[in-house]
Regions:
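Short coil turns that delineate tetratricopeptide repeat
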Residues: 74, 122-123, 169-171, 223, ...
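Short coil/linker segments at helix-helix boundaries
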Residues: 43-45, 60-63, 83-125, 129-171, ...
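Alpha-helical adaptor scaffolds
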Residues: 216, 220-246, 253
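TPR/TPR-like (Sel1-like) alpha-helical repeat modules
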Residues: 203, 209-213, 280-295
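Bacterial Sec-dependent N-terminal signal peptides
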Residues: 1-46, 278
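Extreme N-terminal leader/anchor segments
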Residues: 35-80, 86-102, 106, 117-120, ...
């Protein structure tokens, strides 16, 4: 969904302070994809169905729906971006059966090579978004695997495309999403981690408050890709950066109401409660996480236990007995 220091060694919220900056810097590039003048994007319903299965955490179903896309006339870039998102969900689910790093890199570079020789100012709005998305995902994989310097190089490739999106924020819903993520996380990174000031010296200016407001607007849109990713990042912003735990819980509950079987959302609700010091509620959410994990369709034993095990370690670290 979407966004310097410990990126989730999984998708956890457990970070190591030295690497925390990487997570903030990365977050504004992690998204799947206003007002009356804003052009609303409309992905084909078959693409939406793939994402819907991912959000429901039914990854085998998403895989079947993705494979069916190749026999349609749908734009190949849309198919490839859906493919990359699905590979990412498999990776963070804890699955070890495929080389997701290599698979994602191959697909992303294939998309980039289709577009990279066209001058940025001659691209369609969707092609600009596609290039931002692809370079961002390359960075996402690099940081996840702790290849930080390679990740920074990929981030730099986004700047020409990013500037177009920022200058046209209100023209296109995906640009509004990009602008919200960039403005918030770039400003937050510089404020919390001054070591990154040189990186942003040549980057567009950022406004933390503007970013938050744009993400809030995006969270109210009808496009489920923009709505869900905005809700997800507002949840993470509120508990990881703003320490506004009640607001974070509100967004977590919205996501869980929409997708009650999504283990990622349940895990983050657990982390919010832990970080807020609400240990009895965190323990109850841990139990709920185990229940949902047990019932989730099509997962192997490693995937079923992946987030539960991380949550269990967090409980033990907080001196809470998971068996109680």
């Amino acid at each position: 969904m979407m966004a310097p220091f410990k990126i989730f060694a999984t998708v956890t919220g457990t970070t190591c302070s030295q690497k925390g900056a990487w997570l903030v810097l990365l977050c504004f590039f992690q998204f799947s994809f206003g007002q009356s003048q804003t052009v609303v994007s409309h992905e084909p319903p078959e693409i939406i169905e793939v994402f819907d299965a991912m959000y429901r955490y039914n990854l085998p179903e998403a895989e079947v729906k993705l494979k069916a896309l190749y026999s349609t006339g749908i734009n190949q870039n849309w198919i490839d971006l859906a493919h990359v998102n699905l590979l990412w969900w498999w990776l963070i689910s804890g699955d070890k059966s495929r080389d997701y790093d290599n698979l994602m890199t191959v697909v992303l570079k294939r998309v980039i090579n289709r577009v990279r020789n066209i001058p940025p100012d001659q691209l369609t709005a969707d092609e600009v978004f596609t290039m931002i998305h692809c370079y961002a995902y390359l960075t996402r994989v690099d940081i996840y695997l702790e290849r930080y310097f390679v990740g920074i190089a990929n981030l730099r490739h986004t700047l020409d495309y990013l500037e177009i999106a920022l200058n046209r924020t209100n023209e296109y819903d995906k640009f509004m999403m990009v602008s919200g993520l960039y403005n918030y996380f770039a400003a937050a990174t510089v404020n919390k981690y001054p070591v990154f000031i040189p990186f942003f010296a040549l980057a567009p200016k950022s406004d933390r408050s503007l970013g938050f407001n744009l993400l809030t607007r995006c969270s109210e849109m009808d496009n489920i890709l923009i709505k869900n990713e905005s809700l997800y990042y507002l949840m993470k912003i509120n508990y990881q950066l703003e320490e506004s735990f009640d607001s974070a819980l509100k967004f977590a509950d919205q996501l869980i109401t929409l997708y009650p079987n999504n283990l990622i959302y349940h895990f983050h609700k657990f982390m919010i409660l832990i970080e807020a010091g609400r240990k009895p509620l965190a323990m109850a959410q841990y139990t709920k996480l185990m229940e949902v994990s047990f019932k989730a369709p099509g997962l192997n034993p490693i995937q079923r236990n992946h987030l539960v095990d991380i949550a269990k370690k967090k409980l033990l670290k907080e001196k809470i007995n998971p068996a109680i």
